[in-house]
């Protein structure tokens, strides 16, 4: 009798603890408002056994022209189909710790540009095959004497110029030409209007002419602001404040998705007015918390939103800064 009871207990424990079974019971969660309403896709990006497919995440997301999704994790870059299955991965030493990514088509071929904070460099590699084109170490020709170089963001202008933000160290933004040759640097660390205090994320803001840089100034006081700088490195304006801890920015048309490390994602329109807030976490213990285990994830609730990207249909892919490794798909409701 005791043996039978023990067997039953073990079976029940296995069923309850089985991540795959748990995912089958999760229902989609609707979030947002108006034209920026989304449904979650439970279990998207997980392995068949229900566990995370990527391991710890502290990176970004991009989508190629075929609709495949690339997310960077500590151990490398994983490629997902739109349905959420891993179809490829880049796990060589060159692809670890990509804190931010940008994808770009050049002469009919796609390339990923990455900022590697722990490896003190930027990188460019081919999407097809993963061949490394070049790396961007600290440019000695800048004349700066830095104790540390820790790039957190990268973007590329229409003419091919590359911008690499040293967001975890000096807060200078370094400009290179399309071959990787150093051109200039601008910005400095501080809390002044034109200064940067953790220039954590950055993209090319194509909503305006001329194009400009849209920069996440994560720890500036007041916290949570986005800035515009010209492509020549001139301060333009303070775009918006009060966004918590903005980590990155991704643009589609007139809209910008802004992951906030405090457990939400904000969507702005062309006037930089908030259109929707997604995945808000009401538990202060889970906000900006890397150590939220997969068993404690809540569908439709974020904990440390770090990267995002749009696909051609307006769906969003969102990565949490997370010890278990979390990436989510949000389907646009139309």
Question: Where on the chain are the PLM-derived regions?
Answer:
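Blade/loop signatures of beta-propeller domains
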Residues: 23-43
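Surface-exposed loop and turn segments in beta-propeller and other repeat-based domains
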Residues: 39-51, 91-94, 133-149, 181-197, ...
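Beta-strand-rich domains and repeat architectures in extracellular enzymes and scaffolds
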Residues: 42-75, 325
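Blade-loop segments of beta-propeller domains
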Residues: 48, 74-112, 116-117, 140-142, ...
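Beta-rich, blade/repeat-based domains predominating
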Residues: 50-66, 94-109, 141-161, 192-212, ...
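Conserved beta-propeller blade signature
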Residues: 68-70, 111-113, 161-165, 212-214, ...
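Short loop/turn segments immediately following the C-termini of beta-strands
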Residues: 74, 117-118, 167-169, 207, ...
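Blade-level signature of beta-propeller repeat domains, shared across WD40, Kelch, NHL, RCC1
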Residues: 301-334
